[in-house]
Regions:
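Anionic group-transfer/hydrolysis microenvironments
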Residues: 30, 45, 57-59
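Catalytic cores of nucleic-acid endonucleases
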Residues: 53, 60-117
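Acidic-residue sensor for enzyme active/binding pockets
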Residues: 11, 55-57
C-alpha cells in the first residue's frame, strides 16, 4: 500500500470534502435496475444539489491504480458529469503520466481530474492535466466535465436507496462483530472461572 490510511478513513474524508450534509454521497454502488444511471461498480458517487453526478475511483496503491486500466470499459456513462481518481498524494506525477498515456491509446477514455489525499487525510482536488499549447513542457490543470446530463428525481432516489441499503449492511456487520466480541468475552470469563488457583 502507498498509504497507511484505511479505505473507510478515505471514504469519510471524501464525504466531508463533498459536503455529505448537502449532497448525496454513497460508496460501493453496484449499478443495477432501470433507474440507476450507472452500469458498473463505483467506489463513490456524489449527487450535487443541482442534480449532477460525480464518480470517484478510490485507490490506495499504485498497483490498484494500474489495475483500473485492465477493465474492459473505460468509457463513463452519460450520466456522470465528473470522473476522478482519488489517490495518495505521493502518486500524483506518476498517475498523471499514466493517464496521459491511456488517453493517447484510448480515445473513449476521459477523466475530470485527480483527487489527492495525504496521511492526515487532507483532500486536494486537481484538474485534468492539459499540455500547454504555447509551451509543450508546461501543463495547466482544469476540472473537466465529461458529460452535462442532470439526473432525474427517480435516478437520484435510486442511488440514495442503494446508499441506504449499503449503510444497513455495514451496520449489520458491526452488530455481528460486536456480538462475536461479546461471545468471546463470555468465553474468556468462563476460561478464567475454570482456572484452578
Amino acid at each position: 500500500m502507498d498509504t497507511n490510511r484505511s479505505l473507510y478513513e478515505i471514504e469519510v474524508a471524501l464525504a466531508k470534502h463533498f459536503e455529505y450534509l448537502k449532497n448525496i454521497v454513497v460508496f460501493n454502488v453496484v449499478g443495477w435496475g432501470a433507474d440507476v444511471p450507472v452500469e458498473h461498480e463505483c467506489d463513490c458517487l456524489v449527487i450535487s444539489k443541482s442534480g449532477y453526478l460525480t464518480e470517484i475511483e478510490i485507490k490506495r496503491s499504485w498497483a490498484d491504480f494500474l489495475n483500473d486500466f485492465k477493465k474492459t470499459h473505460l468509457k463513463r456513462e452519460d450520466s456522470i458529469k465528473y470522473f476522478y481518481y482519488c489517490i495518495p498524494e505521493k502518486l500524483s506525477e506518476k498517475a498523471y503520466d499514466k493517464l496521459d498515456e491511456v488517453i493517447e491509446s484510448n480515445k473513449d477514455f476521459d477523466y475530470s481530474g485527480i483527487i489527492l489525499y495525504d496521511e492526515n487525510l487532507n483532500i486536494t482536488v486537481g484538474g485534468k492535466r492539459i499540455k500547454s499549447f504555447f509551451d509543450p513542457g508546461k501543463y495547466s490543470y482544469i476540472n473537466n466535465p465529461i458529460h452535462y446530463n442532470k439526473l432525474y428525481l427517480e435516478q437520484k432516489l435510486a442511488i440514495a436507496r442503494l446508499g441506504c441499503i449499503k449503510t444497513i449492511k455495514e451496520k449489520k456487520k458491526i452488530i455481528d462483530l460486536q456480538n462475536k466480541d461479546a461471545i468471546s468475552d463470555v468465553d474468556d470469563e468462563l476460561l478464567i472461572s475454570d482456572d484452578p488457583e
